[in-house]
C-alpha cells in the first residue's frame, strides 16, 4: 500500500534572500451569498501556509473590502481577477454556488493556462454540465480535483455508497476520466494520478466539520503556487492537514468542537517544524 508519511512529503524551502514573489501568488474564487466564509477560510489557509500573495474573490454582492484578521489578503472582484497575469494557482469552488455567474467563471478559468484546484460547487457544476466537463478533460496544465464522496458520486454518476466501498478504484477512475489529480476526501484520503495512488494516514473525526475542506483547498493552492508539483503538493497538503488535526486532538482541542480555523494555525506550526 502506498501510504503517505512524514518522510515522503516535500516541504517548500525558504531561502534567506527570498522575496514574496518567490513564494507564488494564489487566488481563491467562490463565496456566493451566504457562503463567504468558505473563501475567507481558504484564503487564510493559503496565506498562513506560505503563499507570497493571496487574492480573495467573492461572487456575493456583499463583499468585504478587507479581511480584518488578515489584511494581507487582497480582495478582488471576479472580473478584476481575470486581468491578473502573475497568478501561479487558482482555487475555484469554495462557496461558489450553482448560478449562471458561477458557471461562466468556471468556464473562463478552465480555459486559462494556470494550475487549478477545483473544489466543492465547481465540481458539482462540472458533474452537471458536459461543456464544463469536457473543458476540464481537455486542459493541458495542472488540475487538482478535491471531491468528497458525494461530489465524487455525482462526477462518476454513481452513489456515495459505491464510492465509499471502492475508494481507491473511484479515485483512480476520477483521475483518469478527468485528466486530473484526484484528492478523494474522507477517512484515509486517497490521492490518485493516472495509474498510481497514495493513501493518507493522518487525520481524525474532528475534520468532519464545516470549513475543513475549504482549508485543505487553500493549502493545496498555496503549495502549488510555492512551486511544488501537483502530486507532491497534494500529498504534502493532505498529510499536513490531517496531522494538524491530530496534533490538536493530542492537546484535547478536539475532536469535539475542533474548528477549521484552528487547523490553519496548527498546519503552519507543523510546516515550520518540518523545515
Q: At which residue positions do the language-model features occur?
A:
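Small-residue (G/A/S/T)-rich helix-start motifs and N-terminal tracts that mark the onset
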Residues: 1-117, 124-144, 149-275
Amino acid at each position: 500500500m502506498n501510504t503517505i508519511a512524514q518522510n515522503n512529503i516535500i516541504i517548500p524551502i525558504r531561502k534567506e534572500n527570498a522575496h514574496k514573489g518567490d513564494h507564488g501568488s494564489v487566488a481563491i474564487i467562490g463565496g456566493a451569498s451566504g457562503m463567504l466564509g468558505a473563501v475567507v477560510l481558504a484564503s487564510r489557509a493559503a496565506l498562513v501556509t506560505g503563499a507570497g500573495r493571496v487574492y480573495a474573490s467573492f461572487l456575493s454582492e456583499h463583499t468585504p473590502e478587507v479581511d480584518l484578521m488578515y489584511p494581507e489578503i487582497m480582495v478582488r472582484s471576479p472580473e478584476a481577477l481575470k486581468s491578473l497575469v502573475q497568478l501561479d494557482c487558482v482555487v475555484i469552488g469554495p462557496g461558489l454556488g450553482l448560478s449562471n455567474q458561477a458557471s461562466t467563471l468556471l468556464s473562463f478559468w478552465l480555459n486559462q493556462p494556470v494550475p487549478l484546484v477545483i473544489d466543492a460547487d465547481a465540481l458539482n457544476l462540472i458533474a452537471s454540465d458536459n461543456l464544463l466537463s469536457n473543458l476540464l478533460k481537455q486542459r493541458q496544465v495542472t488540475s487538482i480535483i478535491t471531491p468528497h464522496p458525494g461530489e465524487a458520486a455525482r462526477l462518476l454518476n454513481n452513489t456515495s455508497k459505491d464510492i465509499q466501498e471502492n475508494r481507491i478504484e473511484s479515485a483512480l477512475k476520477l483521475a483518469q476520466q478527468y485528466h486530473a489529480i484526484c484528492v478523494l476526501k474522507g477517512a484515509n484520503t486517497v490521492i490518485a494520478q493516472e495509474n498510481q495512488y497514495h493513501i493518507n494516514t493522518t487525520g481524525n473525526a474532528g475534520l468532519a466539520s464545516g470549513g475543513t475542506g475549504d482549508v485543505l483547498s487553500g493549502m493545496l493552492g498555496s503549495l502549488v503556487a510555492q512551486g511544488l508539483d501537483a502530486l507532491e503538493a497534494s500529498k504534502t497538503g493532505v498529510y499536513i492537514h490531517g496531522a494538524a488535526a491530530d496534533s490538536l486532538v493530542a492537546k484535547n482541542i478536539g475532536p469535539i468542537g475542533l474548528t477549521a480555523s484552528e487547523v490553519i494555525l496548527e498546519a503552519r506550526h507543523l510546516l515550520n517544524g518540518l523545515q
